[in-house]
């Protein structure tokens, strides 16, 4: 079913919130209403969520999706992606490099999210946001308590009740890479969804890496395109100051 929501604005805020996320050193997990303070993941949830700026609010939502340790460990990826257009540019570069290596005739200019009119960009954004939420669940850290916290932060970012309800349902449903992949209606969209999932994944975590590999399979990503997407993500990440 096609859903008329404005996911593009929310997604752009989330993708641009990486600097705030890093400045606040991520988000602590909640356990029985108490903020955890482990060595690597002991971070101040309250100070981040009470940030007045939209960037801080978006960082709070993104940090909760990631989980405290992961937010601190891979928060640089968020800075790498910048915003929605930046993600599209990375997908465009990867797709272009892959096309150049194909023996077959060129398929034309890649239609990534940064090059699309609003209606099509919204469709891509919807699929990308679905991929981000699913990837966030891959390590199993989102319980009912954290889901409520995420819902609260999303409500601060958008007044779109339909979008809020859709996100809550996405968070609540069982993780199913095949179902996520069905949102992709083009190779470019599949590439963007995989890149967005890379953003949320700690590739050293077995569960998350297994999810990512299965998502690539369900998206029917060509092995060469998958390599190019991962190379673009890594190259951009290496350019982020430590």
Each language-model region and where it sits:
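Small-residue-enriched hydrophobic alpha-helices in membranes
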Residues: 2-130, 147-242
């Amino acid at each position: 079913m096609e859903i008329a929501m404005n996911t593009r604005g929310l997604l752009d805020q989330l993708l641009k919130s990486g600097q705030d996320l890093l400045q606040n050193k991520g988000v602590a997990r909640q356990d029985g209403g108490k903020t955890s303070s482990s060595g690597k993941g002991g971070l101040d949830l309250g100070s981040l969520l009470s940030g007045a700026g939209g960037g801080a609010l978006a960082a709070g939502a993104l940090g909760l999706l990631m989980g405290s340790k992961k937010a601190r460990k891979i928060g640089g990826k968020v800075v790498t992606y910048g915003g929605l257009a930046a993600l599209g540019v990375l997908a465009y570069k990867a797709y272009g490099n892959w096309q150049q290596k194909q023996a077959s005739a060129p398929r034309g200019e890649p239609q990534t999210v940064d090059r699309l009119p609003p209606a099509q960009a919204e469709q891509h954004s919807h699929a990308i946001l679905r991929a981000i939420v699913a990837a966030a669940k891959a390590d199993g850290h989102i319980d009912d308590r954290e889901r409520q916290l995420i819902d609260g932060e999303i409500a601060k970012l958008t007044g779109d009740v339909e979008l809020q309800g859709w996100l809550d349902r996405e968070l609540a449903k069982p993780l199913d890479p095949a179902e996520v992949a069905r949102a992709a209606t083009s190779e470019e969209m599949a590439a963007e969804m995989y890149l967005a999932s890379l953003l949320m994944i700690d590739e050293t975590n077995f569960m998350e890496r297994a999810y990512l590999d299965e998502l690539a399979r369900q998206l029917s990503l060509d092995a060469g395109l998958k390599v190019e997407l991962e190379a673009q993500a890594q190259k951009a990440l290496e350019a982020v100051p430590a």
